[in-house]
Every structure is written in C-alpha cells, then in structure tokens.
C-alpha cells in the first residue's frame, strides 16, 4: 500500500492524504456508531492497474465495522494493484434511504475524483453492506 486518502462526502468533498506509516489506525479502525457523515478511505497502490473496489462494511445500519469488514482487506487488494476504498456511510436512524444516498454519492465521487482507478469499478459488502453493494449494482 502506498497512501491513504480520506474523502469527506459531506464536507465540500474535502480530501486529506496520509502516508500509511504515519496513520494512527485507532482513528480509522474499529466500530463506528452513529456516523454523522459519509467518508471514503482510499488505499492507493504502488502499481495501480486501473481497477478499484468499494467495500461497504456491515453493522446492521446501527454501526459500521470498519476494521474486520473493511480495512483488514486493504493490503490484499492493493498488492494486486487494485485501489481499495472503504466506505463509511451515515447511520440511517430508521431511514434506509440515508445509506443508499451515500452509496450513490460515493460512486459519483470516486468516478469524478479518481478516474484513473475506474477502468473497472466494483462494489462489495459484508452483511448489511452486502445490501448496499447489491443496491449499487443498479447504479453502475
């Protein structure tokens, strides 16, 4: 893995890049409850092949398991030249339209801000994140 780029989906699409050796994993990993905003964690490769995968972690729309169902896969994908993107979506608080809105925006942002990674763009998910991945298939 080369770098990590964090993109806030609702803060004017602000982006911040990190060298992975300087990242405090405690800020990124673990289980997030009541996420107020959507964020993309983009793990770049040393030799990107133009492909990327957006990972939608599970958590039953009550929390997001960023570590076990997200960031833990980054090294494997990036070694294959696949840019790996962990998608932290907002919690719906009973409204399933909220994460669906976020995945729509995430796909748009990835295509517009990172076209070099979008020759082949896939979405996968764990648990309820699998639902979001399936929903996103209707948008690709």
Each model region followed by its residue ranges:
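Catalytic nucleophile-loop/oxyanion-hole region of alpha/beta-hydrolase
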Residues: 65-66, 72, 87-119
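Short beta-strand element of the alpha/beta-hydrolase
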Residues: 50-58
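Active-site loop/turn elements of alpha/beta-hydrolase fold enzymes
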Residues: 58, 82, 89-91
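N-terminal cap/lid segment of alpha/beta-hydrolase-fold proteins
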Residues: 1-47, 96
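Primarily recognizes the serine-hydrolase "nucleophile elbow" in alpha/beta-hydrolase
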Residues: 105-140
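A fold-wide structural signal in alpha/beta-hydrolase
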Residues: 52, 78-85
